[in-house]
């Protein structure tokens, strides 16, 4: 498995796939080696769980989730990341990526089709611009999840708390 927290590995993948970050999507990828294991731990990446991951980046958090959970289904809006994920996540048989917009995805149907007999949790490192809409959608929906674990920018957290 590639060390997706190593800046040289990331630079190599950026160059290999000609990938540039999209400001419109607010892309920011996790590279701190201590953060992803903690998010996975708090996000119920353990036996008996299916995890919905919102946004994958290059798969840094995805890999940590897939190490522990029975299944990880990632919803990734940027189709340019799919070939990168084929490379970085190829060793995980319990990982699946769906190229879709989380705000237009029927999560109840996804849970029924992908996580039969499993508890479900949601995990994400959310971009600033979509933090509030995604969190509100998850909280207001009727989806059967045990936990929602998201990492957000400090400013997004302050804005969200001010709205409540």
Identify what each model region corresponds to.
Residues 1-164:
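Catalytic cores of RNA-modifying enzymes
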């Amino acid at each position: 498995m590639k060390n997706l927290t190593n800046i040289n590995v990331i630079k190599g993948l950026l160059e290999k796939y000609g990938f540039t970050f999209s400001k419109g999507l607010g892309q920011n990828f996790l590279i701190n080696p201590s953060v992803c294991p903690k998010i996975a731990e708090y996000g119920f990446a353990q036996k008996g769980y299916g995890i919905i991951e919102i946004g994958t980046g290059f798969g840094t958090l995805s890999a940590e989730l897939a190490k522990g959970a029975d299944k990880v289904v990632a919803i990734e809006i940027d189709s340019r990341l799919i070939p990168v994920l084929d490379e970085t996540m190829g060793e995980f048989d319990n990982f699946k990526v769906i190229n879709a917009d989380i705000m237009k995805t029927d999560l109840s149907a996804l849970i029924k089709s992908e996580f039969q007999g499993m508890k479900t949790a949601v995990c994400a490192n959310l971009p600033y611009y979509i933090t509030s809409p995604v969190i509100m959608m998850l909280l207001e929906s009727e989806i059967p999840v045990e936990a929602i674990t998201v990492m957000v920018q400090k400013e997004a957290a302050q804005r969200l708390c001010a709205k409540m």
